[in-house]
Curated annotation (Swiss-Prot):
<dbReference type="GO" id="GO:0030550">
    <property type="term" value="F:acetylcholine receptor inhibitor activity"/>
</dbReference>
<keyword id="KW-1015">Disulfide bond</keyword>
<dbReference type="GO" id="GO:0099106">
    <property type="term" value="F:ion channel regulator activity"/>
</dbReference>
<keyword id="KW-0964">Secreted</keyword>
<feature type="disulfide bond">
    <location>
        <begin position="67"/>
        <end position="79"/>
    </location>
</feature>
<keyword id="KW-0008">Acetylcholine receptor inhibiting toxin</keyword>
<dbReference type="InterPro" id="IPR003571">
    <property type="entry name" value="Snake_3FTx"/>
</dbReference>
<dbReference type="InterPro" id="IPR045860">
    <property type="entry name" value="Snake_toxin-like_sf"/>
</dbReference>
<keyword id="KW-0872">Ion channel impairing toxin</keyword>
<protein>
    <recommendedName>
        <fullName>Kappa-5-bungarotoxin</fullName>
    </recommendedName>
</protein>
<comment type="similarity">
    <text>Belongs to the three-finger toxin family. Long-chain subfamily. Kappa-neurotoxin sub-subfamily.</text>
</comment>
<keyword id="KW-0528">Neurotoxin</keyword>
<feature type="signal peptide">
    <location>
        <begin position="1"/>
        <end position="21"/>
    </location>
</feature>
<keyword id="KW-0629">Postsynaptic neurotoxin</keyword>
<feature type="disulfide bond">
    <location>
        <begin position="24"/>
        <end position="42"/>
    </location>
</feature>
<keyword id="KW-0732">Signal</keyword>
<comment type="function">
    <text>Postsynaptic neurotoxin that binds and inhibits neuronal nicotinic acetylcholine receptors (nAChR) with high affinity (IC(50)&lt;100 nM). Is a selective, and slowly reversible antagonist of alpha-3/CHRNA3-containing and some alpha-4/CHRNA4-containing AChRs.</text>
</comment>
Length: 87
């Protein structure tokens, strides 16, 4: 009985310690990566500069604690909170 109780305690501690980690697509490779603790928002930014008409927007993907603030040089900004949603 003590062995069963000890096993249950160890399993509970291990499960609680693992926690949940968010994964987001990260530029430039657009591969899923685990976000740092506390960064539970995925984002995708399309940035434009003077070369935008020639080469198109620069795409940035990553993790953030909150959705980045929209700026004037952004063509678009997507924020989401499910795994790998920033594609």
């Amino acid at each position: 009985m003590k062995t069963l109780l000890l096993t249950l305690v160890v399993v509970t501690i291990v499960c609680l310690d693992l926690g949940y980690t968010k994964t987001c697509l990260i530029s430039p490779s657009s591969t899923p990566q685990t976000c740092p603790q506390g960064q539970d928002t995925c984002f995708l930014k399309a940035l434009c500069d003077k070369l935008c008409p020639i080469r198109g927007p620069v795409i940035e993907q990553g993790c953030a604690a909150t959705c980045p603030e929209f700026r004037s040089n952004y063509r678009s900004l997507l924020c989401c909170t499910t795994d790998n949603c920033n594609h």
